[in-house]
Amino acid sequence: MKTLARILVVFTLIVGLIGFFNPLPAQAALNAVDAKLTTEFGQKIDLNNSHIREFRDLRGFYPNLASKIIKNAPYDKVEDVLNIPGLSERQQERLQANLDKFTVTEPSKELIEGDDRINPGVY
């Protein structure tokens, strides 16, 4: 009986040590937002997914024109932003001059859920 107990203890130690010295490699996980950053979303302002603070670098956009853009999303193509109702001629000129800084991707629930694109809570 003692021999059986010793064999069982030794076997348990061997199995345990094999698992200890042979760790599993970490699995790389890529979430939806990381995947979107590999597209134009990471380099340009996405009209369907960006929040209002990303328009601060564009002269004349923050906060009024940027909020109009966000409230009228989603867009199918970048040029659709020129068709926002109620834009002044000056706002249309600013949009036209900066069309190359925008992109349009599919709306992602991870980025627009909670309707916080106007106030994302970043202070």
Curated annotation (Swiss-Prot):
<dbReference type="GO" id="GO:0031676">
    <property type="term" value="C:plasma membrane-derived thylakoid membrane"/>
</dbReference>
<dbReference type="GO" id="GO:0042549">
    <property type="term" value="P:photosystem II stabilization"/>
</dbReference>
<comment type="similarity">
    <text>Belongs to the PsbU family.</text>
</comment>
<keyword id="KW-0472">Membrane</keyword>
<dbReference type="GO" id="GO:0009654">
    <property type="term" value="C:photosystem II oxygen evolving complex"/>
</dbReference>
<comment type="subunit">
    <text>PSII is composed of 1 copy each of membrane proteins PsbA, PsbB, PsbC, PsbD, PsbE, PsbF, PsbH, PsbI, PsbJ, PsbK, PsbL, PsbM, PsbT, PsbX, PsbY, PsbZ, Psb30/Ycf12, peripheral proteins PsbO, CyanoQ (PsbQ), PsbU, PsbV and a large number of cofactors. It forms dimeric complexes.</text>
</comment>
<keyword id="KW-0813">Transport</keyword>
<dbReference type="GO" id="GO:0015979">
    <property type="term" value="P:photosynthesis"/>
</dbReference>
<dbReference type="InterPro" id="IPR010527">
    <property type="entry name" value="PSII_PsbU"/>
</dbReference>
<comment type="function">
    <text>One of the extrinsic, lumenal subunits of photosystem II (PSII). PSII is a light-driven water plastoquinone oxidoreductase, using light energy to abstract electrons from H(2)O, generating a proton gradient subsequently used for ATP formation. The extrinsic proteins stabilize the structure of photosystem II oxygen-evolving complex (OEC), the ion environment of oxygen evolution and protect the OEC against heat-induced inactivation.</text>
</comment>
<protein>
    <recommendedName>
        <fullName>Photosystem II extrinsic protein U</fullName>
    </recommendedName>
</protein>
<keyword id="KW-0602">Photosynthesis</keyword>
<feature type="signal peptide">
    <location>
        <begin position="1"/>
        <end position="28"/>
    </location>
</feature>
<keyword id="KW-0732">Signal</keyword>
<dbReference type="Pfam" id="PF06514">
    <property type="entry name" value="PsbU"/>
</dbReference>
<keyword id="KW-0604">Photosystem II</keyword>
<keyword id="KW-0249">Electron transport</keyword>
<keyword id="KW-0793">Thylakoid</keyword>
<dbReference type="GO" id="GO:0019898">
    <property type="term" value="C:extrinsic component of membrane"/>
</dbReference>
